[in-house]
Amino acid sequence: MEICLGKLCNNRCVFCMSSADRDAHRPWLPPEQVKGELDHFHREGSRSVGFLGGEPTVYPHLLECVAYARGLGYTRIAVCSNGARFSDMAYCRALVEAGATRVTASIHSHKPKVEDGLITKIPGNLAKKVAGLRNLLALAAEGELKDGVSLNPVLCRKTLSGMAGYLRYFSAIGIRDIRFNYIWPSGSVIDDPEWIPSYREAMPHIARILILNERRLGLRLSFGGVPRCAMRLAGLSPRLADHLAAKYLDESAFDPDNDVAAPPEEGALPRRFVWQEHKRDNLKLREESCRPCRHYESCDGVWKTYASLHGLGELEPV
Protein backbone atom coordinates (compact mmCIF):
# COMPACT_ATOMS: atom_id res chain seq x y z
CA MET A 1 0.00 0.00 0.00
CA GLU A 2 1.00 3.62 -0.41
CA ILE A 3 0.33 6.73 1.63
CA CYS A 4 0.31 10.16 0.02
CA LEU A 5 1.43 12.47 2.80
CA GLY A 6 0.40 15.64 0.98
CA LYS A 7 1.24 17.64 -2.11
CA LEU A 8 3.75 20.21 -0.83
CA CYS A 9 7.12 20.06 -2.59
CA ASN A 10 10.48 21.80 -2.84
CA ASN A 11 10.61 21.41 -6.64
CA ARG A 12 8.39 22.97 -9.31
CA CYS A 13 8.32 20.35 -12.06
CA VAL A 14 6.38 21.74 -15.00
CA PHE A 15 4.53 18.47 -15.68
CA CYS A 16 3.65 17.70 -12.05
CA MET A 17 0.25 16.00 -11.80
CA SER A 18 -0.17 17.51 -8.32
CA SER A 19 0.81 21.07 -9.22
CA ALA A 20 -2.59 22.63 -8.44
CA ASP A 21 -2.68 21.16 -4.92
CA ARG A 22 1.04 21.82 -4.47
CA ASP A 23 0.73 25.49 -5.32
CA ALA A 24 -2.43 25.87 -3.23
CA HIS A 25 -0.31 24.82 -0.21
CA ARG A 26 -2.79 22.21 0.91
CA PRO A 27 -1.86 20.87 4.35
CA TRP A 28 -0.03 17.64 5.11
CA LEU A 29 -1.87 14.57 6.35
CA PRO A 30 -1.53 14.75 10.16
CA PRO A 31 0.81 12.11 11.59
CA GLU A 32 -1.93 10.54 13.68
CA GLN A 33 -3.91 9.93 10.47
CA VAL A 34 -0.84 8.48 8.75
CA LYS A 35 -0.44 6.09 11.68
CA GLY A 36 -4.14 5.26 11.52
CA GLU A 37 -3.76 4.28 7.86
CA LEU A 38 -0.71 2.17 8.69
CA ASP A 39 -2.73 0.44 11.41
CA HIS A 40 -5.67 -0.16 9.07
CA PHE A 41 -3.70 -1.66 6.21
CA HIS A 42 -1.52 -3.71 8.56
CA ARG A 43 -4.71 -5.30 9.93
CA GLU A 44 -5.72 -5.98 6.32
CA GLY A 45 -2.48 -7.91 5.82
CA SER A 46 -0.19 -5.38 4.16
CA ARG A 47 3.51 -5.59 5.03
CA SER A 48 4.77 -3.19 2.35
CA VAL A 49 4.29 0.59 2.41
CA GLY A 50 5.44 3.44 0.22
CA PHE A 51 5.45 7.06 1.35
CA LEU A 52 4.58 9.49 -1.46
CA GLY A 53 4.05 13.22 -1.92
CA GLY A 54 4.38 15.94 -2.92
CA GLU A 55 7.84 15.51 -1.50
CA PRO A 56 7.96 13.15 1.50
CA THR A 57 11.34 14.36 2.74
CA VAL A 58 9.94 17.80 3.55
CA TYR A 59 7.09 16.23 5.54
CA PRO A 60 7.98 17.10 9.15
CA HIS A 61 6.96 13.69 10.52
CA LEU A 62 8.43 11.32 7.92
CA LEU A 63 11.04 9.71 10.18
CA GLU A 64 8.46 9.26 12.94
CA CYS A 65 6.02 7.58 10.53
CA VAL A 66 8.68 5.34 8.98
CA ALA A 67 9.70 4.18 12.45
CA TYR A 68 6.06 3.57 13.35
CA ALA A 69 5.62 1.43 10.24
CA ARG A 70 8.67 -0.64 11.12
CA GLY A 71 7.40 -1.06 14.67
CA LEU A 72 4.08 -2.39 13.38
CA GLY A 73 5.87 -5.04 11.32
CA TYR A 74 6.06 -3.58 7.82
CA THR A 75 9.07 -5.24 6.22
CA ARG A 76 9.33 -3.20 3.01
CA ILE A 77 9.25 0.56 3.61
CA ALA A 78 9.84 2.75 0.56
CA VAL A 79 10.14 6.50 0.08
CA CYS A 80 9.48 8.06 -3.33
CA SER A 81 11.35 11.38 -3.45
CA ASN A 82 12.82 13.92 -5.83
CA GLY A 83 16.13 13.05 -4.16
CA ALA A 84 17.51 16.48 -3.28
CA ARG A 85 17.31 16.03 0.51
CA PHE A 86 19.52 12.95 0.30
CA SER A 87 22.58 15.11 -0.37
CA ASP A 88 22.64 15.29 3.45
CA MET A 89 24.20 12.00 4.55
CA ALA A 90 23.06 12.51 8.15
CA TYR A 91 19.47 12.63 6.92
CA CYS A 92 19.99 9.49 4.82
CA ARG A 93 21.32 7.62 7.85
CA ALA A 94 18.42 8.82 9.99
CA LEU A 95 15.96 7.57 7.38
CA VAL A 96 17.44 4.07 7.16
CA GLU A 97 17.82 3.90 10.95
CA ALA A 98 14.10 4.71 11.20
CA GLY A 99 13.39 1.73 8.98
CA ALA A 100 13.39 2.70 5.29
CA THR A 101 14.38 -0.22 3.05
CA ARG A 102 14.00 1.35 -0.40
CA VAL A 103 14.28 4.78 -2.01
CA THR A 104 13.04 5.79 -5.45
CA ALA A 105 14.27 9.13 -6.80
CA SER A 106 12.53 11.14 -9.51
CA ILE A 107 15.45 12.48 -11.54
CA HIS A 108 14.36 13.21 -15.09
CA SER A 109 17.59 14.11 -16.88
CA HIS A 110 21.35 13.82 -16.39
CA LYS A 111 21.79 17.28 -17.92
CA PRO A 112 21.55 20.34 -15.61
CA LYS A 113 20.13 22.53 -18.38
CA VAL A 114 17.20 20.11 -18.68
CA GLU A 115 16.70 18.89 -15.09
CA ASP A 116 17.31 22.25 -13.41
CA GLY A 117 16.59 24.72 -16.19
CA LEU A 118 13.53 23.26 -17.90
CA ILE A 119 11.91 20.79 -15.52
CA THR A 120 12.36 21.44 -11.78
CA LYS A 121 13.22 25.16 -12.02
CA ILE A 122 15.73 24.83 -9.14
CA PRO A 123 19.34 25.84 -9.97
CA GLY A 124 21.89 23.34 -8.69
CA ASN A 125 19.21 20.73 -8.08
CA LEU A 126 20.74 17.96 -10.19
CA ALA A 127 24.09 18.15 -8.39
CA LYS A 128 22.30 17.69 -5.06
CA LYS A 129 20.31 14.75 -6.40
CA VAL A 130 23.39 13.00 -7.75
CA ALA A 131 25.18 13.54 -4.44
CA GLY A 132 22.11 12.07 -2.76
CA LEU A 133 22.19 9.00 -4.97
CA ARG A 134 25.84 8.44 -4.11
CA ASN A 135 24.98 8.65 -0.40
CA LEU A 136 22.13 6.16 -0.78
CA LEU A 137 24.25 3.75 -2.80
CA ALA A 138 27.00 3.97 -0.18
CA LEU A 139 24.48 2.97 2.48
CA ALA A 140 23.24 0.13 0.28
CA ALA A 141 26.83 -1.08 -0.03
CA GLU A 142 26.94 -1.18 3.79
CA GLY A 143 23.93 -3.51 3.81
CA GLU A 144 21.20 -0.90 4.28
CA LEU A 145 18.26 -0.29 1.91
CA LYS A 146 17.84 -4.01 1.24
CA ASP A 147 15.06 -3.36 -1.28
CA GLY A 148 17.23 -1.11 -3.39
CA VAL A 149 17.69 2.37 -4.82
CA SER A 150 15.92 3.16 -8.08
CA LEU A 151 15.12 6.01 -10.44
CA ASN A 152 11.66 7.07 -11.57
CA PRO A 153 12.05 9.62 -14.41
CA VAL A 154 9.27 11.11 -16.52
CA LEU A 155 9.84 10.56 -20.22
CA CYS A 156 8.89 13.68 -22.19
CA ARG A 157 9.95 15.31 -25.45
CA LYS A 158 12.71 17.26 -23.66
CA THR A 159 14.32 14.02 -22.43
CA LEU A 160 13.48 11.65 -25.27
CA SER A 161 16.71 11.91 -27.24
CA GLY A 162 18.83 11.80 -24.08
CA MET A 163 17.66 8.44 -22.74
CA ALA A 164 20.78 6.50 -23.77
CA GLY A 165 23.04 9.04 -22.09
CA TYR A 166 20.79 8.98 -19.01
CA LEU A 167 21.07 5.20 -18.69
CA ARG A 168 24.82 5.21 -19.18
CA TYR A 169 25.35 8.07 -16.73
CA PHE A 170 23.33 6.63 -13.88
CA SER A 171 24.38 3.02 -14.43
CA ALA A 172 27.99 4.22 -14.13
CA ILE A 173 27.13 5.66 -10.70
CA GLY A 174 25.72 2.29 -9.66
CA ILE A 175 21.98 2.49 -10.35
CA ARG A 176 20.56 -0.80 -11.68
CA ASP A 177 16.79 -0.17 -11.51
CA ILE A 178 15.07 2.50 -13.65
CA ARG A 179 11.39 2.98 -14.42
CA PHE A 180 10.57 5.53 -17.15
CA ASN A 181 7.05 6.93 -16.87
CA TYR A 182 5.65 8.26 -20.13
CA ILE A 183 4.50 11.78 -19.46
CA TRP A 184 0.96 12.15 -18.12
CA PRO A 185 -0.09 15.47 -19.67
CA SER A 186 -0.59 17.55 -16.54
CA GLY A 187 0.37 20.78 -14.85
CA SER A 188 1.39 23.73 -16.98
CA VAL A 189 2.12 21.52 -20.03
CA ILE A 190 -1.18 19.63 -20.09
CA ASP A 191 -1.82 20.42 -23.76
CA ASP A 192 1.68 21.38 -24.92
CA PRO A 193 3.07 19.24 -27.76
CA GLU A 194 6.52 20.70 -27.09
CA TRP A 195 6.56 18.50 -23.98
CA ILE A 196 4.28 15.62 -24.93
CA PRO A 197 5.48 13.44 -27.81
CA SER A 198 3.17 11.04 -29.60
CA TYR A 199 3.88 7.33 -29.34
CA ARG A 200 4.60 7.39 -33.05
CA GLU A 201 7.45 9.81 -32.39
CA ALA A 202 8.67 8.21 -29.17
CA MET A 203 8.64 4.48 -29.88
CA PRO A 204 11.70 4.34 -32.18
CA HIS A 205 13.69 6.06 -29.39
CA ILE A 206 12.31 3.68 -26.78
CA ALA A 207 13.08 0.64 -28.94
CA ARG A 208 16.70 1.71 -29.31
CA ILE A 209 16.99 2.02 -25.53
CA LEU A 210 15.51 -1.42 -24.99
CA ILE A 211 17.90 -2.98 -27.48
CA LEU A 212 20.81 -1.14 -25.84
CA ASN A 213 19.76 -2.59 -22.51
CA GLU A 214 19.40 -6.09 -23.96
CA ARG A 215 22.83 -6.03 -25.57
CA ARG A 216 24.98 -4.03 -23.15
CA LEU A 217 23.55 -2.59 -19.96
CA GLY A 218 21.42 -5.33 -18.38
CA LEU A 219 19.47 -2.94 -16.15
CA ARG A 220 16.17 -3.67 -14.46
CA LEU A 221 14.32 -1.37 -16.83
CA SER A 222 10.61 -0.75 -17.38
CA PHE A 223 8.29 1.77 -18.99
CA GLY A 224 4.99 2.91 -17.53
CA GLY A 225 2.19 4.53 -19.50
CA VAL A 226 3.06 2.86 -22.83
CA PRO A 227 0.45 0.41 -24.17
CA ARG A 228 1.97 -2.75 -25.59
CA CYS A 229 0.47 -2.15 -29.03
CA ALA A 230 2.58 1.02 -29.33
CA MET A 231 5.66 -1.15 -29.87
CA ARG A 232 4.47 -1.82 -33.43
CA LEU A 233 5.26 1.86 -34.13
CA ALA A 234 8.97 1.26 -33.49
CA GLY A 235 9.70 -0.35 -36.87
CA LEU A 236 10.77 -3.71 -35.40
CA SER A 237 9.94 -7.22 -36.51
CA PRO A 238 6.71 -8.52 -34.91
CA ARG A 239 8.65 -11.17 -32.98
CA LEU A 240 11.14 -8.70 -31.50
CA ALA A 241 8.39 -6.17 -30.79
CA ASP A 242 6.40 -8.80 -28.86
CA HIS A 243 9.47 -9.86 -26.88
CA LEU A 244 10.39 -6.30 -25.87
CA ALA A 245 6.81 -5.30 -25.09
CA ALA A 246 6.30 -8.32 -22.84
CA LYS A 247 9.56 -7.71 -20.99
CA TYR A 248 9.52 -3.93 -20.61
CA LEU A 249 5.98 -2.58 -21.13
CA ASP A 250 3.72 -5.00 -19.23
CA GLU A 251 2.41 -2.83 -16.39
CA SER A 252 0.30 -5.69 -15.02
CA ALA A 253 3.54 -7.54 -14.27
CA PHE A 254 5.62 -4.79 -12.64
CA ASP A 255 2.87 -2.53 -11.28
CA PRO A 256 0.40 -4.78 -9.43
CA ASP A 257 -2.73 -3.49 -7.71
CA ASN A 258 -2.00 -1.41 -4.64
CA ASP A 259 -4.12 0.46 -2.12
CA VAL A 260 -3.55 4.19 -1.69
CA ALA A 261 -4.41 6.45 1.22
CA ALA A 262 -4.41 10.15 0.33
CA PRO A 263 -5.27 13.45 2.02
CA PRO A 264 -9.01 14.18 1.86
CA GLU A 265 -10.47 16.49 -0.74
CA GLU A 266 -13.33 17.15 1.65
CA GLY A 267 -13.96 16.01 5.20
CA ALA A 268 -11.57 14.79 7.84
CA LEU A 269 -10.65 11.24 6.80
CA PRO A 270 -8.09 10.15 4.21
CA ARG A 271 -9.39 8.86 0.91
CA ARG A 272 -8.71 5.19 0.15
CA PHE A 273 -8.68 3.72 -3.33
CA VAL A 274 -6.93 1.16 -5.51
CA TRP A 275 -4.68 3.19 -7.80
CA GLN A 276 -4.83 0.84 -10.77
CA GLU A 277 -8.65 0.80 -10.70
CA HIS A 278 -8.88 4.57 -10.29
CA LYS A 279 -6.44 5.10 -13.13
CA ARG A 280 -8.24 2.71 -15.49
CA ASP A 281 -11.78 3.85 -14.66
CA ASN A 282 -11.29 7.61 -14.33
CA LEU A 283 -8.06 8.80 -15.90
CA LYS A 284 -7.46 6.66 -18.98
CA LEU A 285 -9.21 5.66 -22.21
CA ARG A 286 -9.31 2.72 -24.59
CA GLU A 287 -10.92 2.38 -28.00
CA GLU A 288 -13.90 0.05 -28.41
CA SER A 289 -11.82 -1.51 -31.17
CA CYS A 290 -9.26 -2.52 -28.51
CA ARG A 291 -11.54 -5.27 -27.16
CA PRO A 292 -10.22 -8.07 -29.43
CA CYS A 293 -6.64 -7.38 -28.27
CA ARG A 294 -5.11 -10.27 -26.34
CA HIS A 295 -3.82 -7.75 -23.79
CA TYR A 296 -7.15 -6.01 -23.26
CA GLU A 297 -7.68 -7.20 -19.68
CA SER A 298 -4.23 -6.10 -18.52
CA CYS A 299 -4.06 -2.81 -20.46
CA ASP A 300 -5.65 0.42 -19.28
CA GLY A 301 -5.11 2.40 -22.48
CA VAL A 302 -3.77 5.97 -22.58
CA TRP A 303 -4.24 9.04 -20.41
CA LYS A 304 -7.36 11.00 -21.31
CA THR A 305 -5.25 14.15 -21.54
CA TYR A 306 -2.91 12.38 -23.98
CA ALA A 307 -5.91 11.37 -26.10
CA SER A 308 -7.12 14.99 -26.12
CA LEU A 309 -3.81 16.00 -27.68
CA HIS A 310 -2.87 13.06 -29.91
CA GLY A 311 -6.10 11.08 -30.26
CA LEU A 312 -6.54 7.31 -30.07
CA GLY A 313 -5.57 6.42 -33.62
CA GLU A 314 -2.26 4.88 -32.54
CA LEU A 315 -4.01 2.11 -30.58
CA GLU A 316 -4.45 -1.18 -32.41
CA PRO A 317 -5.37 -4.67 -31.18
CA VAL A 318 -2.45 -7.10 -30.91
Spans of features found by a protein language model:
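Flexible glycine/acidic-rich beta-alpha junction loops that bind and position SAM and/or redox cofactors
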Residues: D177-Y199, R220-D242, P256-L269
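Canonical Radical SAM [4Fe-4S] cluster-binding loop centered on the CxxxCxxC motif
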Residues: M1-E32
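A short acidic, helix-capping loop that chelates divalent metal ions and anchors anionic groups
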Residues: R22-A24, P112-I119, G187-D192
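Flexible mid-to-C-terminal extensions adjoining Fe-S/redox cofactors in radical SAM and related proteins
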Residues: G235, Y248-V318
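A structural motif corresponding to the C-terminal lobe/cap of the Radical SAM core domain
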Residues: D191-L217, A246-D250, D255-P264, E316-V318
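Radical SAM/AdoMet-radical enzyme domain recognition
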Residues: P31-G50, Y59-I183
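Structural recognition of alpha->loop->beta junctions
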Residues: C92-H108, R168-D177, H243-F273, N282
